Amino acid sequence: MLTGSITAIVTPFKNGEVDYGAFERLIEFQIQNGTDGILVCGTSGESPTLSYEEHEAVIEFAVKSAKKRIHIMAGTGANSTEEALRFTTFAKAVGADSALLVVPYYNKPTQEGLYRHFSKIAKEVDIDIYIYNIPSRTGIEISVDTLERLAKDHKNIKGSKESTPNMDRISEILKRIPNFTVFSGDDSLTLPMMSLGAKGVVSVISNVMPKEIKEFTSYALKGDFEKARDMHYYLLEIFKIMFIETNPIPVKTALSLMGMVKKEFRLPLCEMLPQNEEKLKEVLKKYNLI
């Protein structure tokens, strides 16, 4: 079972192209610091601005670079079922360990439509699937009833990434769905979710502090919530600053300040406001990251 700290890794660019040299160094940085898994082509990986070919190439490169030393979760979701099926089939073929599929966005399907979307992919691709619930970005939320139905009907639907502050929802999922793994999708909500029984976090912060996020989740998994709470408050300031602007703008800027990637985005994402970058620098200095 996948548990602990999963880094939602950024996709570095250089002169408009994916910077595979920097990407390989980022993967090694995660492995050397004990991270449990890496999510590629998620929100933090700027997947909406990757071409189909780039999306697949990034997944394949991550799998090959990892060399089975770390779990690779491929972001394969889309608001077209056929597109999501294409990416998920590819991820399985090149050796990804699991797939994260976002709830289809913009077209706002019904719960029955959501069921059929995930059901089709789970039937056709034999890979562990995690459903990504992030209503603030998708405009729709998959219900607990639909998650329960999917988990009952498809043994390869293993869990969900929950980017929601609704702890009643988390409680309902964990109470009603046996052997279903929940990951926090928000660093600052990791502690409350794990106290309810979530098994870890898909983390933005672990791009820059992988060792600390691993330590944080390890305490919670062992039931040592006093130490986990201490870590939560220690990390709280960096949790906040990394979302001063839209993710992944601050975390990629932080990595550039640390000398790990170029400060390069693809439109419509762009560089931080200068005053916000100064605030970010001050926090990074407090944590001795720059």
From Swiss-Prot:
Pathway terms, separated by semicolons: Amino-acid biosynthesis; L-lysine biosynthesis via DAP pathway; (S)-tetrahydrodipicolinate from L-aspartate: step 3/4
E.C. no: 4.3.3.7
Keyword Protein transport tagged: no
InterPro entries per record: Aldolase_TIM, DapA, DapA-like, Schiff_base-form_aldolases_AS
GO molecular function, one term: 4-hydroxy-tetrahydrodipicolinate synthase activity
Active-site residues from the entry: Y132, K161
GO cellular component: cytosol
This protein's UniProt keywords: Amino-acid biosynthesis, Cytoplasm, Diaminopimelate biosynthesis, Lyase, Lysine biosynthesis, Schiff base
GO biological process, one term: lysine biosynthetic process via diaminopimelate
Class of the enzyme per the UniProt entry, highest EC level: lyase
Annotated site residues (Part of a proton relay during catalysis) in this chain: T43, Y106
Subcellular location: Cytoplasm
Residues given in the record as pyruvate binding sites: S44, V202
Matches recorded under Pfam families: DHDPS
Matching CDD domains: DHDPS
Cross-referenced Gene3D superfamilies: Aldolase class I
Family: Belongs to the DapA family.
Quaternary structure and interacting proteins, as annotated: Homotetramer; dimer of dimers.
Role summary: Catalyzes the condensation of (S)-aspartate-beta-semialdehyde [(S)-ASA] and pyruvate to 4-hydroxy-tetrahydrodipicolinate (HTPA).
Protein name: 4-hydroxy-tetrahydrodipicolinate synthase
The species this protein was found in: Hydrogenobaculum sp. (strain Y04AAS1)
Lineage: Bacteria, Pseudomonadati, Aquificota, Aquificia, Aquificales
